[in-house]
A protein has these predicted regions:
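N-terminal, positively charged/glycine-rich alpha-helical extensions of SAM-dependent methyltransferases
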Residues: 1-35
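Conserved beta-strand signature within the Rossmann-like core of class I S-adenosyl-L-methionine
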Residues: 155-163
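A short SAM/SAH-binding and catalytic strip from SAM-dependent methyltransferases
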Residues: 127-141
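Core SAM-dependent methyltransferase catalytic element
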Residues: 196-210
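Conserved Class I S-adenosyl-L-methionine
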Residues: 171-191
């Protein structure tokens, strides 16, 4: 387990609060839900959902694939996929208020609430998975990634972002190598991409096979 304490105060206070808090995350994101899109996209130049969505479309060209959007939030990533013809999308997020906004966008077949520090119990396994913005400084940690990857059927694909600043500050590459070895999934690619442009934060986009 990585016990480093990076200085997240160098970021916008809204991000710093999210990056430093490990307790009551559901409440935190419930309180942020109403302004989340404008804060991130308009104020901070958030592009993670676009860059990850573009990688996803390369990896999963079949628009009839069953897709789980993990940490779907208000639906930014799901909406981007839907705009490119993907229709079989379910969403899951920690925050009920975020899910309410996503529901109003009429993107998802089903919406579920879950904390991925625990295993996700589902009656089905998905053909593919997109997870944008969940793995960063706080929780869930890289050591919880198997809970995400296990949602996808063998032979499927996972496209998962990791906050690039956290990747460097916390040496998350080493944690990922340990997690993939421990749980037997393959990291096929690690792609450098955008994340939050106005904050100078990039991302690592992981392409993973269960």
């Amino acid at each position: 387990m990585n016990d480093k304490k990076p200085n997240v105060d160098r970021f916008d206070p809204r991000l710093a609060a999210a990056y430093s808090r490990t307790e009551n995350k559901e409440q935190q994101y419930d309180e942020w839900a109403a302004t989340y899109d404008s804060d991130l996209v308009d104020d901070m130049g958030y592009v993670a959902h676009i860059d990850a969505g573009n990688v996803f479309m390369e990896v999963v060209p079949d628009k009839n694939s069953t897709i789980l959007d993990v940490a779907c939030g208000t639906g930014l990533a799901g909406q981007y996929l839907q705009s490119h013809g993907y229709t079989q999308i379910d969403g899951v997020d920690l925050s009920a208020k975020m899910l309410d906004i996503a529901r109003d966008r009429a993107i998802y077949r089903n919406l579920m609430q879950h904390d991925f520090t625990r295993s996700f119990e589902s009656e089905i396994l998905y053909g593919a998975l997109l997870c944008v913005g969940m793995f960063s400084y706080a929780v869930p940690k890289i050591s919880d990634m198997h809970n995400v990857v296990n949602c996808v059927q063998p032979g499927g694909s996972c496209v998962i972002t990791v906050n690039g600043a956290a990747w460097e500050d916390l040496d998350l590459g080493s944690e990922l190598a340990a997690e993939s070895s421990r749980h037997g999934f393959e990291v096929e690619k690690i792609i450098d991409a955008g994340y939050i442009q106005e904050q100078g934060i990039g991302s690592k986009i992981l392409v993973i096979k269960p």
